[in-house]
Amino acid sequence: MTKSNFVDYAKIHIRSGKGGKGSIHFRHEKYIPWGGSDGGNGGKGGDIILRGSRNYWTLLHLKHKYHIFADHGKAGEGKLRHGKDGQNKTIELPIGTAVFDGTTGKFITDIKYDKQEIVLLKGGRGGRGNNYFKSAVNQTPKHSQPGEPYEERQIVFQLKLLADVGLVGFPNTGKSTLLSIVSAAKPKIADYAFTTLEPNLGVVNVHNSYTFVMADIPGIVEGANEGKGLGLRFLRHIERNSLLLFMIPSDANDIANEYKILLNELACYNSELLNKQRILAISKSDMLDTKLEDVIKKELPTDIPHIFISSFTQKGITVLKDLLWEKLRFHDMKEIS
């Protein structure tokens, strides 16, 4: 996904359809000069429906849609003819989309699975025609009902990528390179900060038997929770990852402190992120010998599993994939139990 086609935010004015007006009509048939009422009911207004779809990975298809309106119900007619119902409007959304009220910011719902359907706005009911009000004492009522009004509101859609593993680290720590090595993804890679401007997804194959999805999130900087660097926009994608793989290069000045800064940024954004499983990968470690590794190990945080890796030589890559898979399996077993 590139900057031009990765869209994870959309704000749209939506409106259901109003109900059609009931008809006021009387029979005018030959030889029946005093025919009774035969006004039909109005049609129902169309609903606004949200539907989960695996056919979409981003909100790109909504990028230039500012208004989505369902059709109004048609008015009833004589001879008991019912007005045509307004057509529903269905908005297809990728799995992992959160829905908020665009005015208040209040959370409404989210899309969790394929083909999930949620009626967000209901269309108005059609009004009753005058035939509905006919009685034994009044065969020719001269009134009907208007249709019910439509509903409308501003809605914000925010996509949170669904990935098993999220890569967390400062810019230029080798996250994109790792993703390109363990999957078929082709993220942009260069020797400067903020090469990754949009999230990238890749499917990781483990021993040709199992797969999981890995997400390369743009690099975090100190103060990201306050909007620095690429800011908060991409931190929300970490919320739906089952496991966080922290990546810090072996030549960092203080690995433990960098890890602490990353944790603090996540905690300031959403403290629940600290409840996720974590693994620390020391990247760019192909130039380290055993003695240097032992020195670095003594400086590492003790509350997180760690592994030394190199995407260049593929040192530790197979072991890393196995470790990630085992952690994900353990997470799934806990979810089931």
Swiss-Prot record:
Subcellular location(s) of the protein: Cytoplasm
SUPFAM superfamilies recorded: Obg GTP-binding protein N-terminal domain, P-loop containing nucleoside triphosphate hydrolases
Gene Ontology process terms (BP): ribosome biogenesis
Entry EC number(s): 3.6.5.-
Keywords, sorted A to Z: Cytoplasm, GTP-binding, Hydrolase, Magnesium, Metal-binding, Nucleotide-binding
Molecular function per GO: GTP binding; GTPase activity; magnesium ion binding
Keyword Oxidoreductase part of the UniProt annotation: no
Primary subcellular site in the record, as a coarse category: cytoplasm
EC class: hydrolase
Cofactor(s) the record lists: Mg(2+)
Binding site for GTP: 169-176, 194-198, 216-219, 283-286, 310-312
Chain sites annotated for binding Mg(2+): S176, T196
Gene Ontology CC: cytoplasm
Stretches assigned to the OBG-type G domain: 163-329
Sequence intervals crossing the membrane: none
Domain Obg residues, every copy: 4-162
Alphabetical list of CDD domains matching this protein: Obg (cd01898)
NCBIfam families: Obg_CgtA (TIGR02729), PRK12297.1 (NF008955), PRK12299.1 (NF008956)
UniProt family annotation: Belongs to the TRAFAC class OBG-HflX-like GTPase superfamily. OBG GTPase family.
Record's subunit section: Monomer.
Chain's role: An essential GTPase which binds GTP, GDP and possibly (p)ppGpp with moderate affinity, with high nucleotide exchange rates and a fairly low GTP hydrolysis rate. Plays a role in control of the cell cycle, stress response, ribosome biogenesis and in those bacteria that undergo differentiation, in morphogenesis control.
PANTHER family, sorted: DEVELOPMENTALLY REGULATED GTP-BINDING PROTEIN-RELATED (PTHR11702), MITOCHONDRIAL RIBOSOME-ASSOCIATED GTPASE 2 (PTHR11702:SF31)
Name of the featured protein: GTPase Obg
Organism in which the protein naturally occurs: Azobacteroides pseudotrichonymphae genomovar. CFP2
Gene assigned in the entry: obg
